Amino acid sequence: MNYTLAGAYDSNIALLLTVGDSREAAYEQMAEVLRATRLRGRDLQTNLAFHYGLVHWFLGRTVNARPTTQFIVPYLTAVGELAQEAGQVDVDVAWRLLCSARVDAEVHDKASMRATLAAKESLLLRPIKQLMSSPHLLSGWLSLNKAAFQFEEGHFSSAENPIEVLSDTYHFLRLDWSESLPAANMIWDHDQHILTEAEDFYAELGRRYGCEDWLAIQNLFESGAPESTSDEEWASIIAAHRGFQAGTEILELLPSMARFTGFYDLAVNPDMTISFPERLLDTAYQKAMSKCLAPPPVAKSDEILAASGGMFYGRESPEAPLYVEPGHHFEAGDPLYIVEVMKMFNKVLAPFAGTIEEVLVEGDGVIISKGQQLFKVTPDEKVEVLSEAEISAARSKHTAELVKLFI
């Protein structure tokens, strides 16, 4: 069946139900169902990612938390902070800075280190970019991997094997290897080869030397060659370990962003109630972050675009006058039109003050789409737009500050 959704809602998601032997098992089942669920369509917007991130927020803390109806808006505000932060970070700049630092630190063979990092670039950056493009997925990943990183003396480091974290990330994003899927929907073959080799290497390391966790692996390499291993073989093992770990520090960019925004400040108290940071309860701040989480369509300074699809009404009722007409001056917060979605009538307010030059939608009950031009206007104040070069410079500067937390 082909149909159009006029908002971020779909009953196919709302009616999902899972069961388990425990509350946590039921949550884990729900996380897996949401992970495997795919809805396809033209201009499709649903709340699937929101639910996926929210379920992992509880799994990463405790499924026994007792949130009230007050919880969702502060939670969405925290996710909005992640969205804002993601827009201020350039992953490619972070990667170049990390690679430069690692090559400079290499004593024996800089060329090999440079080649190793180049071979792993897409393996490491592709999932990070996908997470940063979806703040709800990023929220879920940060919740799931809170214990995978530790912050000591102003610096991040791994508390779990980064290779395992990376493998789990591909699964989290449903990018597992498959011979039947298009390349866009799975890990690429050359990246899969590197990741599989790394997983096999650490599995063999565990079998041979009894390394059950990341701490044991670190202790193994710090203590020197085991008696059962020749110096030549041990040198080869060390080289393989260094190669597989090279560049994985880029994963620490994500918890660095979480630390910068205070993502983990929204927490569960010992009595299972929710602890709210004051900033997440501020109404004006909540509205600002909601725009970061669901940004309105990009418009020129002399136009107003439809924030969502639906049915357009230019007046309160059939007998009422139009909200605005050509030549009408409006203030920020004045109603401009009403959009109806699934029998819900939402009044859309002016984001700034200005004068209507032209109304581009004729009549009431007209179906509009998100991003459609509705009004030509002359704003009271000219909006200063930053150039691409200025935006790029600001992102690079902020990214460099974050990179200092893990290099």
Task: List each model region and its residues.
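A residue-level detector for short acidic-glycine micro-motifs
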Residues: G314, E340-K343, E358-L360
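Structured core elements
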Residues: A8, L15-L17, E303-L305, I338, ...
